[in-house]
């Protein structure tokens, strides 16, 4: 590695620290959040791990002294809602934390890695807040935070090509299908994001009029009528990148309806988390995750997520990227 390449990597590392520190400061202030510590692993039988699309298997290990099988978290969606209850948060107060996960079955490409790092967050809300207007108000706060950090990073490192609009554009998954009926869901996201630069697609989970789903969602935490994805257009890669997924959490009625629809009723009696929902023991919350490496990749105008995070990649893959001038950490 030559000196120029080393200097470039060192500058990137410093910029990553700037982005993370700045984002956390503004994020906590704008959403009234307190930072908390979070688990790296949970008991496999607790029901607290996120099973994502129920096809990706969590990485697990046997803890000899505990005589238990533990699972590396795939996200903290369920744990956070329980934490708000246990930690005694008040209405409209929330938490955020660093979530580090291993998703062994994930794809590997310029925006996907088997290592996932994100800010997981959750806020205590009222039942009356379970509506699209409230969801959009939270999205606007998160987007304004991203934009503040973008402007700060532009002044420090001048990536130039990153341009975010003053406001984010909202569209439902059905409206998006109506707009581009002959395109795949991912292609619709790309076309709309390329035009508007920053978008939020809401109401993801149920089939659209075509019979297809925008993208598969677990039925256990988000209300599929009150959730969505925050997506930006990354000009360097000519690509739509999801920076955040979030939603108002399920009530008992939402949970029953969605698990019945997804045919995932078989383990409810033995699942601690499911039982808490069914017995109305969990507070009403809104929450989500914001990809740390993806945000850094986007704001620093990088071609590959491996330029801003350390993971494991196939040797041939790394060699091919190196030929293109892309050095993975």
Curated annotation (Swiss-Prot):
E.C. designation(s): 6.3.1.1
GO biological process: L-asparagine biosynthetic process
Entries under InterPro entries matching the protein: aa-tRNA-synth_II, aa-tRNA-synth_II/BPL/LPL, AsnA
One of the record's GO molecular function terms: ATP binding
EC class: ligase
Subcellular location: Cytoplasm
An annotated GO cellular component: cytosol
Pathway the protein acts in: Amino-acid biosynthesis; L-asparagine biosynthesis; L-asparagine from L-aspartate (ammonia route): step 1/1
Catalysis: reaction(s): L-aspartate + NH4(+) + ATP = L-asparagine + AMP + diphosphate + H(+)
Keywords: Amino-acid biosynthesis, Asparagine biosynthesis, ATP-binding, Cytoplasm, Ligase, Nucleotide-binding
Taxonomy, superkingdom: Bacteria
Family statement: Belongs to the class-II aminoacyl-tRNA synthetase family. AsnA subfamily.
UniProt protein name: Aspartate--ammonia ligase
Organism: Ureaplasma parvum serovar 3 (strain ATCC 700970)
